[in-house]
Regions:
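A general marker of short, structured functional hotspots
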Residues: 7, 27, 44, 61-62, ...
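Acyl activation and transfer enzymes in specialized metabolism, enriched
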Residues: 94-95
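A contiguous catalytic/ligand-binding core that recognizes phosphate-bearing ligands
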Residues: 34-90
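Structure-specific DNA junction-binding interface
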Residues: 1-56, 210
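C-terminal accessory module of base-excision DNA glycosylases/AP lyases that mediates lesion recognition
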Residues: 63-77, 81-86, 103-210
Length: 210
């Protein structure tokens, strides 16, 4: 299931995934992708960037680059991973998969039958760039870079939860944050808002008051 979820995070448009899943081999998928693109199908939703990295990606299309990672994922024995953290650790060893994408796969994986009882279900998260900057802002840092270690930010998020949030949120809201990724998402959105508010970045999307 891990390779299929990785496919879902690479091609994150539901109407496209109907034609691409399950992943079998690169050639067949590239053929289908090319046909869908030629027919005007939207392949990516733009929720996050999918860049090609380093010398491994030189001369390759985005499709080829990430499909090679999906193929490599089909050769891993994921049953040997006992925690979400171990899945993420193994994912980032695949060429082309960074911490952000690995965390997104694990965010989905925790809601599958095989992983709903993972021992780190309520605690695991890999903090992406936006989450890191959001945590820095809460710590009082202006124009943050989010360049400290993953361990630092994981500890900062745990401290934020334990000391500031766990006994102050209404039960209905708190239920959502049992999945630590939801807190991570809030920190990322907070960073986007603050970057625009302080003139650190251009506004790409309009904020709508509810």
């Amino acid at each position: 299931i891990v390779p299929q979820l990785l496919m879902c995070r690479v091609y994150n448009e539901p109407s496209t995934l109907v034609h691409l899943l399950p992943f079998v081999d690169i050639g067949a998928t590239l053929y289908t992708v090319a046909k869908l693109r030629a027919d005007g199908h939207r392949l990516l939703r733009g929720a996050y960037m999918m860049p090609v990295h380093g010398k491994e990606g030189k001369g390759k299309s985005t499709d080829e680059y990430y499909l090679e990672a999906v193929r490599a994922a089909t050769e891993v024995d994921w049953t040997q991973c006992g925690t979400l953290a171990s899945v993420a650790e193994r994912l980032v060893r695949l060429k082309g998969i960074g911490e952000f994408l690995a965390n997104q796969v694990c965010a989905d994986l925790r809601y599958t039958p095989q992983w709903r009882d993972a021992p780190d279900w309520t605690s695991f998260v890999l903090c992406g760039p936006g989450t890191r900057r959001g945590l820095d802002r809460i710590a009082g840092i202006r124009n943050p870079t989010g360049n400290k270690t993953q361990k630092h930010y994981q500890e900062a998020m745990a401290e934020l939860w334990d000391l500031e949030l766990s006994d102050k949120l209404e039960a209905q809201i708190m239920d959502h944050f049992i999945d630590r990724n939801n807190l991570s998402n809030c920190l990322c959105e907070w960073d986007k808002y603050e970057r625009v508010f302080w003139g650190e970045a251009e506004q790409l999307r309009k904020y709508k008051q509810q």
